[in-house]
Amino acid sequence: MKKGRLKSIIFGGLFSLFIPLGAYLFLKSKGHDGHITLPKQYGIASIDSNIVDGKLQLDTTYHTVADLLVYSQLGDTLALHETYKGKILVYNFFFTSCQTICPPLTKNMKLLNKAFLKNDTSIRFISLSVDPLHDSVPVLRRYANQYEANHDKWIFATASKKSIYDFARYQLLLDLPQGNGDEQDFIHPEQFVLVDKYRNIRGYYNGLDSNDVRRCAEDIAYLLVEKNKIHEKKKR
């Protein structure tokens, strides 16, 4: 994968991100051959070993994020991974009454959203409320409108508390205190989580850190290159 193609995606799609963040994305050297290294996968599910031509080969299988049934700010019931099959997803967590970290988290998610408007068929941004008791459909819609969300591309959603909390802990593999989603349980993660079209986790980012938000943007661009290259091969 050549840098020239990657730069056209980054600088075409992310220019609007650089000004709000106070800097532009610096594409570091990825090797003397001009190729890039794609974001690694997280969550090893299993490792199989085989002997091929007398040599030991390891085949690593990575965790696949299971689907989640939610209701959105538009009142739609969505199975997220089925609805957005083949798309890159960026997840974060919030609740509408939060006055501490949620506003800056949501503003940074908005910046990412705006940065990739030209790639809106390939990416969806998913903000999951950790307070389903309070965050009803009308409340989610008002909150989405407050941040001028494109409702087709940026989904504000929730589900049962146990479903959301289990998804954060056991599917997105966030490092959170143990709990069972009951009334006393509460999580407030500040990470953005990048999931590729195969539902493998490809990155964790501090959504309050501008450098990490840039890194998330860079990794999204890498996955777009990966997606486009696969598509081009199929067309040949």
Give, region by region, the residue ranges found by the protein language model.
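Short active-site neighborhood of thiol/selenol oxidoreductases, capturing the structured segment around
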Residues: L78-M109, F125-L128
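N-terminal targeting signals for export/organelle localization
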Residues: M1-V65, R236
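Structural microenvironment flanking redox-active thiols in thiol-disulfide oxidoreductases
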Residues: T106-F167
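Short, small/polar residue-rich loop motifs at catalytic or cofactor-binding pockets
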Residues: H63-V65, K87-I88, I187-P189
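Coil residues (strongly favoring Ser/Thr
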Residues: S49, T60, D76-T77, T121, ...
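Structural micro-motif
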Residues: D152-W154, Y165, R169-P177, F186-V193
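Thiol-/selenol-based redox modules, centered on thioredoxin-like
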Residues: N180-R236
